[in-house]
Amino acid sequence: MIGRISGQLAEKNPPEVLVDCNGVGYEVLVPMSTFYNLPGLGEKVSLLTHFVVREDAQILYGFGSATERAAFRQLIKISGVGPRTALSVLSGMSVEELAQAVTHQEAGRIIKVPGIGKKTAERLLLELKGKLGADIGVQVSVSSDSQSDILQALVALGYSDRDAALALKALPKDIGVSDGIKLALKALAK
């Protein structure tokens, strides 16, 4: 599975971006919240990803934070909600707004998202209740390759996105990968 993509931002056409990685351009679909926070064309970009393989397509979805990716993964587990619908939900409202709507059982807020009807909104509320809050408690934007590498290493070691994000948030921004992993593991062991 492809967990992260880093490279030069070659094109931006909502909701799709093209990331050039050593001469190979990868098309990545991103929610609008991530799209608006992307750097300018030609600048370096790093996105956490979710890779979807279907019979007729292979699609890479990109996210600016581990929290956003975790919410996407929770959404696509719901019957009747595919990756495109999940992307639409995350484009129409922030992860925090979604978590709030789920906590307060506000279907009306979710129905405002294009492509989401009353039944789908109610199913989202029912199936996300108690699940979404655990992953949404902390949002960490990955601002450097070393932070992204630390986050990926912690997730690969079996820690949840939330626990890895909490550990990463406590680290100094300019820490190296190996030192960062060691400190994060010590913090997680407590």
UniProtKB/Swiss-Prot annotation:
Residues 137-141 are annotated as: Flexible linker. Keywords: Cytoplasm, DNA damage, DNA recombination, DNA repair, DNA-binding. Disulfide bonds: none annotated. Residues 142-190 are annotated as: Domain III. Transmembrane segments: none annotated. Residues 1-64 are annotated as: Domain I. One of its GO terms (molecular function) is four-way junction helicase activity. The keyword DNA-binding applies. One of its GO terms (cellular component) is cytoplasm. It comes from the Bacteria. Its main location: cytoplasm. GO terms for biological process: DNA recombination; DNA repair. CDD domains: UBA_RuvA_C. Residues 65-137 are annotated as: Domain II. Belongs to the RuvA family. The RuvA-RuvB-RuvC complex processes Holliday junction (HJ) DNA during genetic recombination and DNA repair, while the RuvA-RuvB complex plays an important role in the rescue of blocked DNA replication forks via replication fork reversal (RFR). RuvA specifically binds to HJ cruciform DNA, conferring on it an open structure. The RuvB hexamer acts as an ATP-dependent pump, pulling dsDNA into and through the RuvAB complex. HJ branch migration allows RuvC to scan DNA until it finds its consensus sequence, where it cleaves and resolves the cruciform DNA. HAMAP family: DNA_HJ_migration_RuvA (MF_00031). Homotetramer. Forms an RuvA(8)-RuvB(12)-Holliday junction (HJ) complex. HJ DNA is sandwiched between 2 RuvA tetramers; dsDNA enters through RuvA and exits via RuvB. An RuvB hexamer assembles on each DNA strand where it exits the tetramer. Each RuvB hexamer is contacted by two RuvA subunits (via domain III) on 2 adjacent RuvB subunits; this complex drives branch migration. In the full resolvosome a probable DNA-RuvA(4)-RuvB(12)-RuvC(2) complex forms which resolves the HJ. This is Holliday junction branch migration complex subunit RuvA.
